[in-house]
């Protein structure tokens, strides 16, 4: 005869429900221990950035090969246009990245190049800049390390700023070395002396000089050409009145000089 009773008993110990506590996500997030603030830790909005190396406190100095090239290039440029380009470099593409648009990640070389491309806009062409900084990049290890840390920090930043504007806010853009180059080259440029205006009542005469054929040429004989006439008002030094030929005085020129004074 079949029976539904169990043939043996098994003792099963059930875990108490009180030992398992469910916590909400908000509580669990608050229980996470925050890292201690140190020189190797920078806190950004929504991002905790850990650096294995200390980031630079300022933008690294420009390469010497780039400085030397700029000094030679500035000699061929208009100084006022160069100063205007330096003043407008902070105003180019100053818009922030849209919140809906994902910010592009940059590497160390792109960060290095985009900084100098924006800073030297109007001074060097893109071809000149790429040639110079690419050669320096391959040989200078410290430059690569510094810009690698700067690029990593920018990629973890959530402010949504363009790289150059982000550098200006967090590091500051130093243009003093560029202004010093422009002003130094401007001091070396020889200045043109202004014409010396003499008193027309004492020495405002035309001087008659010798012609190539060793004959004196007067104003009437030269077909109204003033190539052989030297006007003393364009001299830097004052001449005595006796050194001019008073017989070659042109009245119309004197009137024009008097009206211009």
From Swiss-Prot:
One of its GO terms (biological process) is positive regulation of mating-type specific transcription, DNA-templated. GO terms for cellular component: nucleus. Residues 101-158 bind DNA. PROSITE patterns: ALPHA_BOX. The keyword Glycoprotein does not apply. Pfam families: MATalpha_HMGbox. One of its GO terms (molecular function) is DNA binding, bending. It is found in: Nucleus. Keywords: Activator, DNA-binding, Nucleus, Transcription, Transcription regulation. Its main location: nucleus. The keyword Nucleus applies. Mating type proteins are sequence specific DNA-binding proteins that act as master switches in yeast differentiation by controlling gene expression in a cell type-specific fashion. Transcriptional activator that induces the transcription of alpha-specific genes. Required for mating as an alpha-cell. There are three genetic loci for mating type genes in K.lactis. MAT is the expression locus that determines the mating type of the cell, whereas HML (containing HMLALPHA1, HMLALPHA2 and HMLALPHA3) and HMR (containing HMRA1 and HMRA2) represent silenced repositories of mating type information. The mating type is determined by the MAT locus, which contains either a copy of HML or of HMR. Diploid cells are usually heterozygous for the MAT locus. Belongs to the MATALPHA1 family. This is Mating-type protein ALPHA1. It comes from Kluyveromyces lactis (strain ATCC 8585 / CBS 2359 / DSM 70799 / NBRC 1267 / NRRL Y-1140 / WM37). The lineage of its organism: Eukaryota, Fungi, Dikarya, Ascomycota, Saccharomycotina.
